């Protein structure tokens, strides 16, 4: 894989959906809890799969999980799980579907405790600011960080599923808490 493809971080390749995601979302700071919940759902679903697989099913996940409304997802029942096991728009993994419902309940508890999931996430960053890395090569980008290690450890302790340090790091990248756009990427100097 090339470090830079068409001026972008090489991981997004030339797939139009992937490039659009890279250009318009990945690494942009997200402060909205609904969007943070969306990324949490999608990143958790990605465990063991490629991100493009989940990205292509994003609209299916949106329909399946109440437009990513955590309060509604938290109310889902075993009947909803059975229904979603037959829904073509998502990866049909019972454990991941059930964990999404559990994670929604825990997400709401964190909002109550910290005022927002955004505030909770910032609590793992010593100066409460996003990290902007200056990597020149994809091989320099780590799969985890002290922040993702601490956050995933705390989330696991709270009962979250499918959210280990690597998934947490991907979540932090996606939502702009860690900016890993390569220094030569076209998105590098854009306003976040």
Language model regions located:
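HhH-family (HhH-GPD) DNA N-glycosylase catalytic core used in base-excision repair
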Residues: 1-192
């Amino acid at each position: 894989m090339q470090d830079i493809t068409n001026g972008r971080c090489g991981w997004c390749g030339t797939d139009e959906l992937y490039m659009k995601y890279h250009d318009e979302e990945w690494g942009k700071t997200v402060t909205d809890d609904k969007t943070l919940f969306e990324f949490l759902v999608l990143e958790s679903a990605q465990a063991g799969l490629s991100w493009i697989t989940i990205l292509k099913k994003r609209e299916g996940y949106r329909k399946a999980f109440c437009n990513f409304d955590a309060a509604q997802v938290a109310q889902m029942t075993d009947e909803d799980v059975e229904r979603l096991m037959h829904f073509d728009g998502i990866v049909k993994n019972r454990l991941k579907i059930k964990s999404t419902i559990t994670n929604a309940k825990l997400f709401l508890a964190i909002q109550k405790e910290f005022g927002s999931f955004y505030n909770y996430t910032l609590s793992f960053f010593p100066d409460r600011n996003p990290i902007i890395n200056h990597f020149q090569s994809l091989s320099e980008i780590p799969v985890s960080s002290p922040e993702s290690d601490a956050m995933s450890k705390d989330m696991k302790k709270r009962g979250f599923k499918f959210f280990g340090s690597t998934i947490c790091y991907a979540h932090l990248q996606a939502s702009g808490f860690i900016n890993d756009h390569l220094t030569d990427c076209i998105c590098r100097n854009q306003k976040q």
